[in-house]
Design a protein with these regions (language model features):
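Residues that act as N-cap/strand-start positions at coil-to-secondary-structure junctions
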Residues: 1-4, 342
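Cleavable N-terminal signal peptides of Sec/SRP-targeted secreted and luminal proteins
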Residues: 4-22
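Signature for phosphate-centric chemistry
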Residues: 23-117, 121-306, 310-472, 477-481
Length: 481
């Protein structure tokens, strides 16, 4: 693997649980038809709130080379490494590739169609992460002739309209708030009592008692406040900054464990919560894979690689829904999974193989069958094939993969039902969310109304032009075309 690596003493490895052993064989006659990845953004600077919740860490906050909350130079390199790994694994001209699936350029075979589609969560650190992957996947020299670089377009939504990556921040906000309030009254006090010593130490280090965080200007709830402070110390470590005076490595690790336990238990303790945390991404993933499950795929006139970029919460939620267990050695654990390295990437390979004679007898009209092969990679660990615990085999049949998600949602109801969300229809006050809807809506104008608007615009334009000519002549100026 090229690019960013830790020193050998700090190299972390994936535990064996959930990973496929090297000597386990798989069908070698399958073909890759579509590739989907979901990546966590890279290392970032702490959230703004820590300026008031830990004023004694000001020296470290001032040392960051980027604005607070944004991707650091280390985070950018981590995601560039993701792109380089994808290039090494799937690019046609790479010597150690596993499969010749992607062209050397974004522009595809004979410049017929972009091969890769990038979509990011509304947060800028997610879109920057997507851009950094593009740098690694399409380095200088792979752009169109005459322009060495390859700009990669990133699709994004406003956060209030982002239902596939951030439903809890939009239509599910009130549902989330209700669940968080219940957690704060039940489980959170139990955990805080267990970690009382480290929380008291945190208050002394930062100069603000944990219980006072909600009362500060621009403060937040205590659980989220502890999470943001734990993140701050971890980000400081990743940036190579010194420990804040009074903080110890042991206390930082305990704080990180508390924050991760809170995150997992208050977001994913029930199937219902998992459903709305995944939100519309489950539909996006299923549709993206299903559209590639045809014998003519991948066509030169369509995308073949879909690169999605979000927060750790989406990866954890999807993992819980699918039975994808994360086990990174040395990281905090809760609900039988570990936390994630920055840049952790989930790979979904849609593959096709010829039917066996027995399968052909049962499905006379079908020519091939489809399955999903899953891998995991991070800037700190090697590529590992993952078996979903909810699937019967490692190479999960596409129908069974779909059923894992649909069965989960059938138990809980859709995220829209859980969050009491009703998709706006054209004619309501809400603006349409897609370009197609906008175009369709514009077609609804009556011909006379359109002509009236154009007529008024022409009259106003002529009047303004006449006024400018008159004014110029009064001032002795000559009009310039």
């Amino acid at each position: 693997m090229r690019g960013f690596r830790l020193t050998p003493a700090l190299m972390l490895a994936v535990l064996a649980t959930g990973a496929i052993t090297a000597d386990q064989s798989f069908p070698s006659d399958s073909e890759l038809r579509r590739l989907v990845t979901l990546s966590r953004h890279g290392s970032r600077a702490p959230n703004d709130v820590v300026k008031v919740t830990c004023p004694r860490n000001k020296a470290n906050l001032d040392a960051y080379k980027v604005p607070l909350t944004q991707l650091t130079e280390i985070g950018m390199k981590q995601l560039q490494d993701v792109g380089e790994h994808i290039r090494d694994t799937y690019m046609v001209d790479e010597p150690h590739r596993e499969e010749a699936f992607l062209s050397r350029s974004l522009n595809g075979v004979n410049h017929s169609h972009f091969e890769a589609y990038f979509r990011a969560d509304a947060a800028t650190r997610c879109s920057q992460s997507a851009t950094a992957v593009g740098y690694g996947l399409y380095p200088d020299g792979t752009g169109p002739q005459g322009f060495p670089r390859q700009p990669v377009p990133i699709t994004m939504q406003l956060v209030e309209n982002e239902h596939a990556f951030a439903a809890p921040k939009g239509p599910c906000r009130s549902t989330l708030d209700e669940d968080l309030a219940e957690y704060a009254e039940t489980r959170a006090p139990e955990l805080f009592a267990q970690y009382r010593d480290v929380l008291d130490q945190l208050g002394e280090v930062c100069g603000v008692a944990v219980e006072d965080i909600p009362n500060l200007p621009d403060g937040e709830d205590v659980v989220l406040g502890v999470k943001d402070l734990a993140d701050m110390f971890v980000f400081d470590r990743d940036e190579g900054l010194p420990l804040t005076e009074g903080m110890t490595v042991e206390a930082r690790e305990k704080l990180e464990q508390l924050a991760f336990t809170n995150l997992m238990e208050r977001y994913y303790s029930t199937d219902r919560e998992i459903t709305y945390w995944v939100g519309g991404f489950s539909d996006l993933l299923l549709n993206t894979l299903q559209e590639g499950a045809i014998s003519t795929a991948p066509s030169p006139a369509e995308y073949r690689y879909f690169s999605f970029h979000g927060h750790r919460e989406l990866l954890h939620g999807l993992g819980m829904m699918l039975g994808w267990e994360f086990h990174f050695k040395g990281l905090p654990t809760a609900l039988n999974v570990s936390s994630l390295h920055p840049g952790t990437t989930m790979f979904f390979e849609l593959r096709a193989r010829k039917l066996t004679t027995e399968e052909t007898e049962k499905q006379s009209e079908a020519k091939e069958t489809y399955f999903v092969r899953t891998y995991m990679w991070s800037p700190y660990t090697e590529r590992e094939q993952i078996k979903l615990t909810k699937c019967s085999v490692a190479d999960c049949p596409l129908d069974e993969f779909n059923q894992i998600i649909t069965n989960h949602i059938a138990k809980t109801g859709t995220w829209e039902t859980i969050c009491n969300y009703h998709k706006p229809t054209l004619g309501q006050d809400e603006a349409p969310l897609t370009q197609g809807a906008v175009v369709e809506n514009n077609h609804g104008f009556a011909g006379c109304s359109f002509v009236t608007v154009i007529g008024i615009a022409m009259v106003v334009g002529l009047a303004l032009a006449a006024f400018k000519v008159y004014t110029a002549r009064r001032r002795g100026y000559t009009m310039v075309g």
